[in-house]
């Protein structure tokens, strides 16, 4: 069973980052995804006045569950939107781990050399974003 949960303990977040071979960002918020109690990935992100930044959306070493990462990415985006931040950037480090195509499936588009998503109404009409978030 897939479980995506917020990571509130910073030492736990640091351990999960090590398991995902990514840098620990102590001032970032974090979600972790587990399948049958096994860590499959994490998402570190920041809420900022000019928009949120997804710093990392990455797999744990030895795992390849892209469905879990997709769900965790969308959960992160929903959290960001619900907290009043309606623009979100997919940082270059996050893109390097996955791919531009994966970010676009989440709903991001290229704008000004970066990947952005406008979350205004994004979760009100999910069908509006096409299959797996890609524009129609």
Where are these regions (language model features)?
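Short acidic/polar active-site loop segments enriched in Thr and Asp
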Residues: 86
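Short, aromatic/basic amphipathic alpha-helical patches
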Residues: 98-108
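C-terminal "cap" of GNAT-fold acetyltransferases
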Residues: 106-136
């Amino acid at each position: 069973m897939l479980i995506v949960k917020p990571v509130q303990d910073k030492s736990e977040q640091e351990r999960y980052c090590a398991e995902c071979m990514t840098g620990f960002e102590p001032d970032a918020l974090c979600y972790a995804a587990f399948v049958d109690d096994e860590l499959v990935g994490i998402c570190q992100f920041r809420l900022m006045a000019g928009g949120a930044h997804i710093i990392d959306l990455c797999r744990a070493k030895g795992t390849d569950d892209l469905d879990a990462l997709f769900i965790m990415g969308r959960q992160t985006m929903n959290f960001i939107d619900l907290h009043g931040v309606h623009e979100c950037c997919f940082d270059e480090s996050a893109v390097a781990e996955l791919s531009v195509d994966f970010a676009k499936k989440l709903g991001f588009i290229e704008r000004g050399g970066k990947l952005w998503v406008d979350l205004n109404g994004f979760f009100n009409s999910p069908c509006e974003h096409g299959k797996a978030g890609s524009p129609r």
